[in-house]
Design a protein with these regions (language model features):
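Assembly/oligomerization interface modules of large self-assembling protein complexes
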Residues: 1-76
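Short helix/loop capping segments that flank catalytic or ligand/cofactor-binding pockets
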Residues: 48-51, 90-91, 168-170, 250-252
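Glycine-rich, charged/polar anion/phosphate-binding loops
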Residues: 66, 143-147, 225-228
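Broad gene-expression machinery/nucleic-acid interaction feature
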Residues: 75-81, 156, 238-240
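Alpha-helical scaffold segments that mediate packing/assembly in large oligomeric complexes
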Residues: 76-151, 262-265
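Helix N-cap / beta->alpha transition motif
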Residues: 83, 161-165, 213, 252-255
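Extended, solvent-exposed, turn-rich assembly/linker loops in the middle of proteins
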Residues: 120-190
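Sequence/fold signature of self-assembling virion shell proteins
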Residues: 173-265
């Protein structure tokens, strides 16, 4: 018998291995329900400046309000069906590998949901500002610098890129720094000359990069942790486990994320 707690623990382990969500989310909120309403506050301008206040004068206020539209939470999951013979005669280590892979697939789907919100917003008219390179199929270092500079007053400390954009970036002369190469070979982690952590993911469309300030860009809303429902079909000698998790994403500050697209060649 595959115990539900063993299944849930193995799936969670797979979700945590190589999970990029902690690198792009500013906060995690646990919420019981299917619809969630986040908060908003305008960044920049007079509403955020700490100006000098004369004696007896009113202190400028920053107003935090709930968003106009709800954030919808989605259920992601997989049904695991195992025969009596598979459970009876195989080692648990083999099942752990399969369960970790299921967890990895769920994590990829959650990342795809996060990318969708970063690019198009969460339904509250907060899609990311987008820019495009001048040359077709070409990404220059000057364009990366301009993209980085557009984040003020935020800081671009994380850069999500598709595989083809990563290849274009690695071929730039500015990325040939020996220390950058040594760090990449030793740890597998690559930092850009602009100081942002570079994360490659297959869930991004081709020719796309998303820059963000991970401190202010995205909120992860968890409706439930990994849940396992277990039963048996005695007449067929099958054991089944439904593995599900409910979560969604809310965009906190619109200016904390931007999209850079390499013009199609």
């Amino acid at each position: 018998m595959l115990f539900p707690e063993y299944i849930a623990r193995s799936v969670r382990q797979g979700m945590e291995e190589g999970d990029l969500l902690p690198s792009i989310t500013a906060a995690t909120t646990r919420f019981e329900g299917m619809d969630y309403r986040s908060i908003t506050a305008q960044a920049g301008g007079d509403s955020k400046e700490l100006k000098a206040v004369d004696e007896g004068a009113s202190i400028p206020a920053t107003t935090i309000q709930v968003q106009a539209n709800l954030v919808k939470l989605r259920k992601r999951g997989r049904m695991l069906v195992a025969s009596y013979e598979a459970v009876r005669y195989q080692k648990l280590d083999l099942f752990s590998v399969t369960l970790r892979q299921i967890g990895s697939h769920i994590a990829q789907m959650l990342l795809a949901d996060a990318v969708e919100v970063l690019i198009h917003g969460d339904g509250n008219d907060n899609a990311a500002a987008a820019s495009e390179t001048k040359g077709a199929g070409v990404l220059t270092y000057d364009e990366l610098v301009d993209f980085w500079a557009a984040f003020d007053p935020y800081e671009m400390n994380t850069l999500l890129v598709s595989s083809d954009v990563l290849l274009k970036m690695l071929k730039l002369a500015e990325f040939q720094n020996p220390l950058t190469g040594l760090n990449f070979q030793g740890t597998g982690k690559l930092s850009t000359p602009l100081g942002a952590t570079l994360l490659r993911t297959s869930v991004l469309p081709k020719n796309t990069a998303i820059g963000l300030d991970k401190r202010y860009a995205l909120e992860l809303v968890q409706g439930s942790d990994v849940t396992v429902e277990y039963d048996k079909l005695i007449d067929r000698q099958l054991e089944r486990a439904a593995i599900t998790t409910i979560s969604g994403f809310a965009k906190l500050f619109q200016g904390a994320s931007r999209v850079l697209t390499v013009k199609a060649s």
